[in-house]
Amino acid sequence: MAVEIIVDREKCIGCGRCYDVCPKGPLIWTKDENGKYYAYDVEYCHNCKFCAGRCPTNAILIKVVKPKKKDENKNKK
């Protein structure tokens, strides 16, 4: 299952709760130059949504992304 973690940087206050509560915290989350967190490697995310649930400003959205099939474009001419 592939996921996309979207952080609204306008809403993020840089509290670090997403990082702290995430079972894979250091593998997924990092800070930008303004001290706000973002997900830089979602490969390790298993969609527990702890980060979104703990965010005090609701700045985190997690979307399940369906991977494209390899043969999806082969039959189109």
Swiss-Prot record:
InterPro entries: 4Fe4S_Fe-S-bd, 4Fe4S_Fe_S_CS. [4Fe-4S] cluster 1 binds at C12, C15, C18, C22. Keywords: 4Fe-4S, Electron transport, Iron, Iron-sulfur, Metal-binding, Repeat, Transport. Its cofactor is [4Fe-4S] cluster. Residues 3-32, 36-65 form the 4Fe-4S ferredoxin-type domain. Signal peptide: none annotated. [4Fe-4S] cluster 2 binds at C45, C48, C51, C55. PANTHER family: FERREDOXIN SUBUNIT OF PYRUVATE:FLAVODOXIN OXIDOREDUCTASE-RELATED (PTHR43122), IRON-SULFUR-BINDING PROTEIN (PTHR43122:SF1). Ferredoxins are iron-sulfur proteins that transfer electrons probably in the CO-dehydrogenase complex. This is Uncharacterized ferredoxin MJ0722. It comes from Methanocaldococcus jannaschii (strain ATCC 43067 / DSM 2661 / JAL-1 / JCM 10045 / NBRC 100440) (Methanococcus jannaschii).
